[in-house]
Amino acid sequence: MSFHHIPVLLNEVLEYLNPQPGEVYADGTLGGGGHSEAILQAMGETGTLYGIDRDPAAIAAATERLRVFPGFHAVHGNFHDIKELLPGVQLNGGLLDLGVSSYQLDTPERGFSYHEDAPLDMRMDTTQGMTAADYVNTVSEQEFCRVLREYGDEKWAARIAQILIEKRSEKPLETTKDLVAVVDAAIPKAVRRKDEGHPARRTFQAVRIAVNDELAPLEQALRDWVDMLVPGGRLAVITFHSVEDRIVKLTFRKLQNPCTCPPKAPICTCGKKPLGRAIGGAIKAGKEELDENNRAHSATLRVFEKGT
């Protein structure tokens, strides 16, 4: 299967990043290379772009797609480790498109989709780490309940966690169908019928986030990316659910106003200066894109500009 992935909010990303010839950019979530291709086209032959991804399949596909650009450099790794991956590099701009790619969802054997029966994997980097099967067969009931609530906004978290423990005591969960069966057994049929989306979508999202440790290092990663920007450089971040968006929004707010003095203090004595400003607010896709790309409905873009 080719690595097909429609880049969301592409026009908005280009508008806010405004890449120019000779500049240096990093795409921390390379995926199919759609955003990277547009940035490289805008910069021309003199621009440089580092495309980072945890998924070896994404690296291979994007390298093939972008080989016509002399300034493209593929980097296998996690965007959380940007300072180790690109030591000493200063960026005019950066992009993070968080979440799972269309390719990963559409490749059954990766185990991300609740629509297909496949091994319960969900690793973004298939060369390392525990699988989703490892996780759901060892996690405690209390911890699984917390993960479902915090990462999936799942109202039936306690019941799903209880059923998970019961089911795996009979037989270890091995496939995506096994995990869907847990959700089906936990949520009443009448409630499932009223659900606009698949009832297992929140559970799958929560498990994926836990397996890939997507949120715990996110705030520090955002700080590291901003630190690597040149003055006036911009970081664009696309999120797909409220938990991620909240972290991005609050981190940008802290970077814009890092002062830790008491609220009623007459003057600032902590010495912490603003690192820049958030611009544009929460940017959503327009009607035309929403009509063409269903994934764009849940996408939110936020942009931070480093101070000069």
Please report, for each region that a protein language model flagged, where it lies by residue.
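S-adenosyl-L-methionine-dependent methyltransferase catalytic core, i.e., the SAM/SAH-binding region
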Residues: 1-308
